Structures are given as structure tokens and as C-alpha cells.
């Protein structure tokens, strides 16, 4: 045992050195990020990331570290560097931005994000407790250059109507709803009338360290000018553009279905009669990977996840597709089952 204690102490020292090196790596990444910010160069450069990944794999081959482990370490340090660089201020021409619902989770995130880029941020929110930015009325907020609607889906259309009525034709207006169907008619009508409207969906939550390397969907609602200006605001992110009518169908799979799979998986485990400790003790590699995602989902905001399931009308089709897929897993013949998995592998390529 004393010998084991000595070896474990040595491992602890090695771990400290590793974390020290990661910290030093972050310091260098920050300096690189500052240089990128000066020229508005992109934070994420896929070709450079591939070089880093291969560098780790090659180094691992010489030190007895498997390629899979080397790749995962590379991704961890690269992702850390991206967040370090993504948090750096990238100042833009200052504009006044009012966030309706700015004291909620994503409202706070957006307020800090825009303020860090040099914009003048105010919020309009009935809940003012702990507000970090000036709180204004909707009428005053509507005088801003940019107005962001960050409210629950259930009241968003009414808020949008009020904002359109109170604001000038020059104001850029967009929502960040996870479900677009309730506001599409009003957004399209406003777009046809020449208003600068679009619809945005950051594909991450308020726990995100930065927007860099993360997806932001910009939906066109008839005003290219508004969509272009929204894209500039989020230009450190990976921008995907689509028509607003396409959004909910895609979201039904990337949000509704992916959430439902993990929630249903966890529910099946809860009702299995096993404790989590018992199943972890005999876990397979796949089970460990699946539960790593499912435990994060289980600890998310249940009210928000309920809303995502219920408020997107396209979710029913996605969940029926899932039900059919589960049925196929249960009933297909051997050859059909193998063919199904082969098709899945091809789809992911």
C-alpha cells in the first residue's frame, strides 16, 4: 500500500502539471484570439483544428496513447481554446439594443454578449430582480436600433405586435424563439410591409461559454437587410440561414426528437427496477456514452423542455417517426436489421 500511495501521489503531480499546461495553452490561445479580433478573423478554423487533432494522434502513437483517447483530448483542449477566444470582446459599431425579456436566462446571456461587443444594452422585463442592465418600458425600448424578443413562446406574438406598433421602420426586430410557428404570420406580414424583421435561434442555452463554434440559425422573413444585420451581431458563431417556414421542421428533429430520445431513455431506466448504481456497475461503453448525454438532459429546465415538446407542431411527425423506428428495431428480420444499420452508417458519413 505505501508503494501505491507513492505512485498515486506521482499521478497527482502529473495531473497538476497537465492542468498547468492546459492553462498555459489557454493563455497562448487568448493572445492568438486577441490578434484574430483585431482583424475580425474567424475564431474557429477547421483546417487548423484538424492539424491539432492529427498532432495529438501522432504524439499518442509514440507514447502508447490510443488514437481515440488522443482525439478526445485534442477536442477537449481545442474546444477550451475556442471558448477562451470566443469570450474575448470583438467590438462592433455601437448600437442601442433592447432585449424584451432580458432578465431571463437567454436574455441575460444576450445582454452580456452584446454589451461585450460594445453595444448599449437595455432590457424590458416585468421581473427586475437582479437586473444587470438598465430596465426600460417597452415604449422606450422600442426606440432602440435593435429590438430582440426573448420571451416565452406563449406571449411572443403579442409582444411582437406591440413592438412593431411602437418602433420605427428603421428598427431591426427579431425573436430568439425555439418555435417559430406562432410568430410567422406577423413576421411575414411585417416583412412584406418593408419592416426590418427576421427570426433568430441560437442553438445553445444560457450555460454556453461563448457563441464561438456554436450554431445560430438566422431565418429570413422578407427583409434581407434585417437578416444580414442579425448575422453580423452573431458573426463569431456558425451561421445557418433558412426560410422561417423551414425552421420548426428542422427543430423537431434537432431539439424535439433528440430531447425525447434522452427523456424516454431515462424514463425507461427509472421504471426498470434497477438503481442507477446497479446499472453503472455493469455498464457497457454504449450505455456510458448514452447516459452521459441523458443525465445532462435530465438536469435541464423541465418546464422549458416541456414547452419545446408541446409548442412545436412539427414534433408529432418526428415522434411518430421515432415510434416507427422503435417498432422496426423490434420486428425486422436479421437481414432487414443489418440493412437498416448499414443505411444509418451511410447517412452519418
Please provide the spans of the model-predicted regions.
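An accessory alpha-helical subdomain
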Residues: 240-349
Amino acid at each position: 500500500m505505501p508503494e501505491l500511495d507513492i505512485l498515486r501521489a506521482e499521478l497527482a503531480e502529473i495531473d497538476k502539471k497537465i492542468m498547468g499546461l492546459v492553462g498555459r495553452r489557454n493563455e497562448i490561445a487568448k493572445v492568438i484570439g486577441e490578434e484574430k479580433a483585431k482583424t475580425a478573423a474567424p475564431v474557429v478554423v477547421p483546417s487548423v483544428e484538424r492539424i491539432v487533432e492529427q498532432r495529438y494522434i501522432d504524439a499518442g502513437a509514440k507514447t502508447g496513447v490510443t488514437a481515440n483517447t488522443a482525439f478526445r483530448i485534442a477536442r477537449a483542449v481545442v474546444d477550451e481554446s475556442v471558448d477562451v477566444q470566443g469570450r474575448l470582446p470583438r467590438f462592433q459599431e455601437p448600437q442601442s439594443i433592447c432585449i424584451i425579456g432580458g432578465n431571463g436566462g437567454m436574455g441575460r446571456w444576450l445582454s452580456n454578449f452584446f454589451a461585450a461587443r460594445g453595444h448599449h444594452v437595455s432590457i424590458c422585463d416585468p421581473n427586475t430582480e437582479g437586473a444587470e442592465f438598465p430596465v426600460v418600458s417597452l415604449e422606450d425600448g422600442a426606440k432602440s436600433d435593435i429590438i430582440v424578443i426573448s420571451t416565452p413562446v406563449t406571449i411572443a406574438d403579442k409582444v411582437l405586435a406591440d413592438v412593431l406598433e411602437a418602433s420605427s421602420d428603421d428598427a431591426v426586430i427579431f425573436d430568439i424563439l425555439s418555435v417559430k410557428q406562432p410568430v410567422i404570420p406577423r413576421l411575414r406580414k411585417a416583412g412584406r410591409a418593408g419592416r426590418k424583421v427576421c427570426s433568430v435561434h441560437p442553438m445553445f442555452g444560457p450555460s454556453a461559454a461563448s457563441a464561438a463554434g456554436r450554431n445560430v440559425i438566422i431565418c429570413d422573413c422578407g427583409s434581407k437587410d434585417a437578416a444580414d444585420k442579425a448575422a453580423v451581431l452573431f458573426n463569431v458563431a456558425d451561421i445557418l440561414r433558412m426560410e422561417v417556414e423551414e425552421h420548426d421542421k428542422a427543430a423537431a428533429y434537432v431539439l424535439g426528437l433528440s430531447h425525447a430520445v434522452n427523456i424516454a431513455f431515462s424514463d425507461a431506466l427509472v421504471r426498470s427496477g434497477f438503481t442507477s448504481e446497479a446499472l453503472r456497475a455493469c455498464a457497457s461503453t454504449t450505455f456510458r456514452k448514452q447516459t452521459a448525454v441523458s443525465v445532462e438532459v435530465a438536469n435541464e429546465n423541465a418546464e422549458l423542455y416541456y414547452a419545446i415538446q408541446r409548442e412545436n407542431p412539427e414534433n408529432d411527425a418526428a415522434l411518430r417517426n421515432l415510434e416507427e423506428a422503435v417498432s422496426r428495431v423490434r420486428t425486422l428480420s436479421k437481414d432487414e436489421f443489418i440493412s437498416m444499420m448499414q443505411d444509418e452508417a451511410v447517412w452519418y458519413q
